[in-house]
Design a protein with these regions (language model features):
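Gly/Ser-rich "nucleophile elbow"/oxyanion-hole loop immediately N-terminal to the catalytic nucleophile
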Residues: 64-71, 115-163
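Alpha/beta-hydrolase-fold serine-hydrolase catalytic core, especially in secreted/extracellular enzymes
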Residues: 235, 244-247, 252-302
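Short amphipathic alpha-helix adjacent to the substrate-entry channel of hydrolases
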Residues: 87-106
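C-terminal motif of bacterial Sec signal peptides marking the signal peptidase cleavage site
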Residues: 15-18
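Short beta-strand element of the alpha/beta-hydrolase
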Residues: 69-80
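The feature captures the conserved acid-bearing segment of alpha/beta-hydrolase catalytic domains
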Residues: 175-252
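Hydrolases whose catalytic domains are alpha/beta-hydrolase-1, hotdog thioesterase
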Residues: 164-168
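N-terminal cap/lid segment of alpha/beta-hydrolase-fold proteins
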Residues: 23-70
Length: 302
């Protein structure tokens, strides 16, 4: 009896994850397996959780492998056009999640691959995603209890979603930010109404590493994004360009080529992966040797 009691106490001390047997599934009101769950080591489910309205979650189908020794870092995502659904980006986000990340996208789950026509999303929805992840990690009744790495959270977004990310960039819970096909407007008068519009001064308030992933000079956000990058002199900053224009490669199989720097950056910044760091560090970094990519970085990257 004493031995049983001791083992039970040990399980509690290890956040209840190490002693559980069998798979642990996330809660979902509706869900979909995208591209066989991704190519990473953890098959993913795209789902809607009843406790987080107007958000889409990409989570491992089985949460059992995650716990104190292998927690899930978090990526919160804002969509292009500030659309309230990740319908253009779900393949890209699904692939990232399959490599051991909890991805929470702003907006309603895209059960069908068709444009979302509802109202725009808001910057606050990214903050809701962060709040939810932290609360789930602390909730003993949640399947995510003790499985989320709340010390390693990234915010990212594409186009208008990138502006939402920059709007939230000073949140102290963020470890890094990733800006895709976006940048603060050099001329705010050219912006679409209702877009978040922080001034360029916001860049000097950022205290975490930043990566810009852009579509080359044909990308309508190229000048704004590169201008941002050149202003970031106090934090590690990296700019990667792939010549596909503003739309990126998100809708291609497994998110296409944009997944390479995005995943590598998150593995480096949120998991401390030294192999992933080689994509970005050094004069002969891995990404510069990958066909099609051009890169710039400041001295703080190396």
């Amino acid at each position: 009896m004493k031995r049983i009691a001791f083992l039970s106490a040990a399980c509690l001390l290890m956040l209840g994850t190490a002693c559980q047997r069998g798979p642990v599934a996330p809660v979902a009101t509706q869900s979909k397996v995208v591209e066989d769950g991704g190519t990473g080591p953890y098959k993913v489910l795209m789902l809607e959780d009843p406790s987080l309205e107007a958000h889409t979650i990409f989570a491992p189908q089985n949460l059992a492998p995650f716990g104190k020794k292998n927690p899930l870092p978090v990526l919160v995502w804002g969509n292009g056009a500030c659309t309230n659904s990740p319908w253009e980006h779900y393949k890209f986000l699904n692939e990232i999640a399959s490599h051991g990340f909890l991805v929470i996208a702003t907006g309603y789950i895209p059960m069908e691959e068709k444009p979302y026509r509802g109202p725009m999303s808001t910057s606050a929805q990214q903050i809701e995603s962060i709040d939810w992840a932290i609360a789930q990690n602390a909730d003993k009744n949640s399947p995510y209890y003790g499985r989320i790495d709340v010390e390693n959270i990234a915010a990212a977004g594409m186009s208008c979603g990138g502006l939402q990310t920059l709007d939230n960039a000073t949140d102290p819970r963020l470890k890094t930010i990733m800006i895709c096909n976006s940048g603060l407007f050099i001329n705010p008068g050219t912006a679409v109404p209702n877009m978040p519009m922080p001034s360029k001064d916001r860049l000097q308030e950022i205290t975490v590493p930043v990566i810009y992933i852009l579509g080359g000079p044909e990308d309508i956000a190229y000048e704004n994004g590169m201008d941002d990058f050149h202003r970031l002199v106090k934090v590690p900053a990296f700019a990667a360009n792939y010549p596909v224009g503003h739309g990126g490669t998100y809708r291609q199989e497994h998110g296409g080529e944009f997944t390479v720097p995005a995943l590598g950056w998150l593995q480096w910044q949120l998991k401390g992966d030294k192999e992933a760091a080689k994509l970005f560090q050094g004069a002969d970094c891995g990404l510069v040797n990958r066909e099609g990519w051009t890169v710039e970085k400041n001295d703080l990257i190396d």
